[in-house]
Amino acid sequence: MNDHDGVLTHLDEQGAARMVDVSAKAVTLRRARASGAVLMKPSTLDMICHGTAAKGDVIATARIAGIMAAKRTGELIPLCHPLGIEAVTVTLEPQGADRLSIAATVTTVARTGVEMEALTAVTVTALTVYDMCKAVDRAMTITDIRLDEKSGGRSGHYRRHDADVKPSDGGSTEDGC
C-alpha cells in the first residue's frame, strides 16, 4: 500500500510541522478526482441552470474559480507543495431538483500527488456558487467534499469504495444545466 500508512508525514520526530522532502521520489503522471455538492432550493438551481442569476453565469464563473484555485493550492495549504498543473477539469451538474454536483480532476507530472488541488478546486467552486447565489438562498449547504480517486506515485491507485467515477471523466466540460 503506502510506506507511510498510519504515519503523519508532515511532522518531524519532535512533532514540529515540516514540508515533506519529495526530492527522492520519481516524477510520474499523477491524477486525482474529487467531488462535492451544493444543496439549495429548487428555484435557486433553476435560476443557475437558466442563467438568470443577478451576478451572471454561475456555472462558468464557478468553473473558472475552481480551476484558478487548483493552481493556487500551494499558496493556500501551508505544507502543500507548489506544483505545475498539466490539466484541471471542473464540472457542475444538477442532480434532482435541489443539488448541484461538482467534480474536479487534476493532472500533473510531478513527484507528489494532486489530491489537495482537486479538493481545493471542488471547495472553491462550491464557495463561488454560494457567493453568487446567497442573495436568493442563504440556506444553501456545501456538502460531501471528498477525494474519489487518485493515481500515480508510490502509493498507487486509490478509488473510494462508493465513488461514482465516470470512465470518461477528466476531459468532459459539458454540464447538465
Swiss-Prot record:
Origin species: Mycobacterium bovis (strain ATCC BAA-935 / AF2122/97)
EC class of the enzyme, as a word: lyase
Subunit structure: Homohexamer; trimer of dimers.
Transmembrane regions listed in the UniProt entry: none
Binding-site residues for substrate, renumbered to this chain: 79-81, 116-117
Name assigned to this protein: Cyclic pyranopterin monophosphate synthase 3
Recorded family membership: Belongs to the MoaC family.
Pathway noted in the entry: Cofactor biosynthesis; molybdopterin biosynthesis
Single GO biological process annotation from the record: Mo-molybdopterin cofactor biosynthetic process
GO MF term set: cyclic pyranopterin monophosphate synthase activity
